[in-house]
Each structure stands twice: as structure tokens, then as C-alpha cells.
Amino acid sequence: MSQGVVQEMVATALLGALDGAKKKGQLKTEAWPALTLDAPKRPEWGDLASTVAMSLAASEQRAPHDIAQIIVENLPRREQLFERVEIVRPGFLNLTVKPALWQEVLKEIESQGAAYGKADLGRGRRVLVEYVSANPTGPLHVGHGRGAAV
């Protein structure tokens, strides 16, 4: 189990909560917004944070905090996945994943050693990576953007 798998499990749980709330008639949005999970700015705020409740506020015509409460109430496998789920105004969901899940990630890292995280993504193809550096002493202009695109 990798860190990406843990994030995928959390995302699946959040989508399950949204689907469950919709089936109960608590939410009416037809299509869910893109679900993003980010690391909070402070470690005490948890492992992952989501703004999905704020993304739904306009389409639901409700306060993000109320939507976040509905999501938390409908979270599947909440006790198995989360140590703590916190709602912070205006509607942030701060999620602390159970330590046992992170311990599984650490076990995988330890067992794979230096091979952890390696992938055969490019399959031997060469890739050229360039970056654009604008003149730091002059103003930015359209040519800088053109140089980045070409």
C-alpha cells in the first residue's frame, strides 16, 4: 500500500459519502466537482484536507459548513480509515488517517528499499525537460509566454 493508495481510499470514502447523501436526498447536485486532497498547511490540522464542501456550496445553495457536516455523517468506513475528521469553517474537511494505514505504507517502503517509487513509465524513451527563465531585471511580456510554449 503506497501513500497514493491511502489518498485514493480517502477520496473513495469522500465520494461514497457524497453518493450516500444524494441517495438520502440530503444533496441534489447532479455531478460532483473534482475532488482534491491536499496536505494541510499545519500538521495539527491532519494528514489531508478537502474543500469539496465549499465547491458544492453554490450548486447546493447551502452553507459549506452544513454540506461538510452531511459529508461527515455519510462517510463510509469512517472508523476504519480515520483517526479524526474535523470540519473547520467555512467548510474545510481536515482528515487524520489512522496510523495503521500509514504503518502499512512504511512497511511497503521498507520492504521495497531503493526500488520503492520506481516506475517504468517512459519505457526507455528520452525526455527533454526545459524551463523558462524570464529576465529578472526587466518586465514580463508576451514573448516570455511564447518562449515557454515553443
Regions found by a protein language model. Give the residues of each.
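Charged, compositionally biased N-terminal leader segments and the immediate start
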Residues: 1-37
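Short, small/acidic-rich helices and loops at N termini and domain boundaries
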Residues: 44, 48-66
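Short, well-structured alpha-helical segments that form the helix of a local strand-helix-strand
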Residues: 68-76
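Structured, non-catalytic alpha/beta "coupling" segments that mediate domain-domain communication
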Residues: 76-111
